[in-house]
UniProtKB/Swiss-Prot annotation:
Gene Ontology MF terms: GTP binding
Region feature (Disordered): 98-117
Organism classification: Eukaryota, Fungi, Dikarya, Ascomycota, Saccharomycotina
Protein name: Genetic interactor of prohibitins 3, mitochondrial
Function: May be involved in the mitochondrial lipid metabolism.
Keywords tagged on the record: Mitochondrion, Transit peptide
Record's compositionally biased regions (Basic and acidic residues): 98-110
Subcellular location: Mitochondrion
Domain CP-type G: 180-395
Domain of life: Eukaryota
Family under the similarity heading: Belongs to the TRAFAC class YlqF/YawG GTPase family. GEP3 subfamily.
């Protein structure tokens, strides 16, 4: 249950004050007291106020709320045209003459409807398929709804959260309304020595792990929950067997985190949440990057407790006897009501779950910065208190430019779609569908980034980001269309960001480090694209990635190698196989992470130096002067990239390295150009 009274926190904080003499602790205690002594928004944790409509935390007092309910714009238009119809046309529209319902049945149905839960349309708007969920939620009994309202009667939300969650209204996506912070700022507000549970996003692993956390807590003190496992695994058993093995291996070998301090879960599917309740200690602070699913996990914990209580109540002999008597009475009276089948019980359970998630716990949104303050949640039945903490970003670049990116995205629906992710076990394995990118082509996903492939090359691409990508014949074509979408109406669905000269000039140029075999190109918070070279290699020219400010990316070894059994390239006796025999004679095995080689690499920045050129600069110059890009300019750009890769490898290996067309990259040296 979410608490707004801070007296229990006052007592605990005062006891710590007398036992410790620490300035950082005092600062954290003061922050905790101020947070809990005043009423806060149950969704985002910001301090509530009713005086300034434009200020953070504004909410409408109960007595000042207008009686008129919110009506969607579509319904307003529909009502306008219906009111203009004649009575006969209205009857024809609703097909009144064909109804064959008796007066008694109509009265019975009306009585049934009057007992259904009266759910706000604003609540329904937050649940995806609105028509479906509206009908499903309204079927939840009034009794269940009343119990929720009675138990969780402190659900006060600010106007911003109501608009964002229930009406998809993000008009003021700014630092004031959706604040982003760095890890240092978050940790400065948490009392020292309190338990930290770090939530990790499996969707872009390991980008959501900030190594700076180990400056505040030792690896033995930290606990990690890897969330969104349902995107990687088809079932909870696979998550337990393969996911738990890989993620605990990685955190142990990389950061010396004890394997018993790691859990792999799905917040939306409640995988292993009975164990999560025991795993999370009293007075734990749940931290993590934006959009990692902290609030979803807390909702899952609350729902699991509620479900456990209902199960215990249902198993009571008195309640069972009462239920059996009621069923006997219904049968004897030949009532229209029938005992629920297994399918109906499952539907009823799902309806209650949807109602519970919409009413109880902190707010959940795909918008970064939605949680604005520390939210205290009392798990009364577990005798525990936990804290939902605002998400953070890992770099100043994201802190400054993150809001700009989200303001450019054309629709809130697109935001929700791309953050939802895809099932990697369907889209990202060796048996999944792929497309082929050929030399010179340029790939984009909605105009968010551009990935350019070198001439004389060929790659298989498997998309694990929840938006279709589009291949252009060349980068020049991609740039022109992305900045002139009005001339190409058929391309509108391919882009959710429209560029202009200003936004194009802001794009940052990165070199993909040389690699051998397949890799994943990971875009933070969105997912990855699996890239596999195919055919004969004829050039050492690298792949080039253009990213806008505020968007981060890395490359990594294919994660499917570690979370599913894959071909080893050897037969049953351990002998290496030729490429054409791998699928027919090769054996499958689960690869274990040992930290012997890098698992991922950051990208090589190609923007350093005032004299550095780029394809984009040459294209924009060509468009301005109406002169084509010359071969000499292209060759100079390739040499520039080779030199930059050599500098990068020199730093990574500690010895001077050169990189050119004669350099051989194979199994023996494929990690020489990777730097974590």
């Amino acid at each position: 249950m979410i608490r707004y009274s801070g007296f229990s926190v006052v007592r605990s904080c005062l006891s710590r004050t007398f036992s410790r003499n620490n300035s950082a602790l005092s600062t954290a205690i003061t922050s905790s007291l101020l947070t809990n002594l005043f009423p806060t928004c149950k969704s985002c944790g910001v301090r509530l106020q009713s005086s300034d409509p434009k200020g953070p935390g504004y909410y409408i007092l109960e007595e000042s709320k207008p009686a008129k309910r919110f009506v969607k714009s579509e319904d307003q238009v529909f009502a306008k045209y219906v009111n203009d119809l004649s009575l006969e046309d209205k009857k024809l529209l609703i097909n009144e003459d064909s109804k064959k319902v008796s007066d008694s049945e109509s009265r019975s149905e009306s009585q049934d409807l009057s007992n259904e839960a009266d759910i706000d349309s604003s609540l329904v708007n937050s649940l995806g398929n609105k028509d479906y969920y509206a009908s499903e939620i309204k079927k939840v009994s009034q009794k269940d709804k009343f119990k929720l309202e009675e138990k969780y009667n402190d659900s006060v939300e600010c106007v911003r959260c109501r608009d964002a969650t229930y009406r998809s209204n993000f008009k003021n996506f700014s630092q004031q309304e959706y604040p982003l912070e760095l890890l240092d700022n978050i940790m400065s507000r948490i009392p020292p020595h309190e338990q930290i549970v770090y939530i990790v996003n499996a969707q872009d692993f390991p980008m959501s792990i900030n190594p700076k956390i180990f400056q505040y807590r030792s690896s033995n003190e930290l606990k990690f929950i890897v969330n969104k496992a349902d995107l990687l695994f088809k079932s909870i058993n696979l998550s337990k067997n393969y996911g738990q093995t890989f993620f605990s291996d990685y955190l142990f070998h990389k950061y010396r985190v004890p394997k018993e301090n790691v859990m792999v879960v799905s917040g939306t599917n409640y995988w292993d949440f009975d164990k999560v309740l025991d795993f999370v200690d009293d007075n734990s602070y749940l931290i993590g990057n934006v959009n990692c699913g902290k609030s979803t996990i807390i909702k899952g914990m609350l729902y699991t407790i509620d479900k456990s209580n209902k199960r215990k109540k249902f198993m009571s002999s008195r309640e069972r006897t009462k239920m059996e008597k009621e069923q006997d009475m219904l049968i004897n009276r030949a009532s229209r009501m029938k005992a629920m089948t297994a399918g109906e019980k499952k539907k009823e359970k799902k309806r209650y779950e949807m109602l519970f998630r919409s009413k109880v716990g902190p707010g959940v949104s795909h918008i970064p910065g939605f949680t604005r303050g520390f939210i205290q949640i009392d798990l009364e039945d577990m005798d525990k208190t936990i804290y939902d903490v605002p998400g953070f970003v890992n770099s100043e670049n994201q802190l400054i430019h993150h809001h700009d990116i989200y303001n450019k995205i054309s629709s809130p629906k697109i935001l929700k779609q791309i953050h939802k992710g895809v099932k990697v076990y369907d889209k990202g394995t060796y048996t999944s569908k792929y497309i082929t990118a050929k030399g010179g082509q340029s790939l984009t996903i909605g105009g968010l980034f551009f990935l350019n492939f070198p001439q004389k090359s060929m790659y298989q691409l498997r998309n694990c980001i929840n938006h279709d990508f589009h291949l252009f014949s060349n980068f020049s074509r991609a740039v022109y269309i992305s900045s002139n979408l009005s001339k190409y109406p058929g391309m509108g669905s391919k882009f959710f960001i429209e560029h202009d000269d200003s936004s194009l000039k802001e794009l940052r140029r990165f070199i993909i480090p040389p690699f051998h075999g397949s890799i994943d190109l990971v875009i933070q918070n969105l997912g990855h694209i699996n890239i596999k070279p195919t055919g004969r290699k004829e050039t050492n020219q690298p792949l080039i990635l253009y990213l806008p400010p505020g968007v981060e990316a890395i490359i990594r070894l294919p994660i499917t190698n570690y979370i599913a059994k894959t071909f080893t390239g050897r037969d049953a006796k351990g002998n290496p196989l030729r490429k054409e025999n791998i699928l027919t004679k090769g054996v499958l095995a689960l690869q274990r992470y040992t930290a012997k080689y890098p698992f991922y690499s950051t990208l090589i920045s190609a923007n350093k130096g005032a004299e550095v050129s780029s394809e984009l600069a040459l294209i924009l110059k060509s468009e301005a002067t109406c002169e084509p890009v010359t071969d000499a300019e292209q060759e100079r750009l390739v040499k520039q990239d080779f030199a930059r890769i050599g500098e990068w490898a020199t730093i990574a290996r500690g010895v001077e390295c050169n990189y050119n067309e004669r350099t051989v990259v194979d199994e023996r040296n494929k990690f020489d150009y990777w730097m974590e």
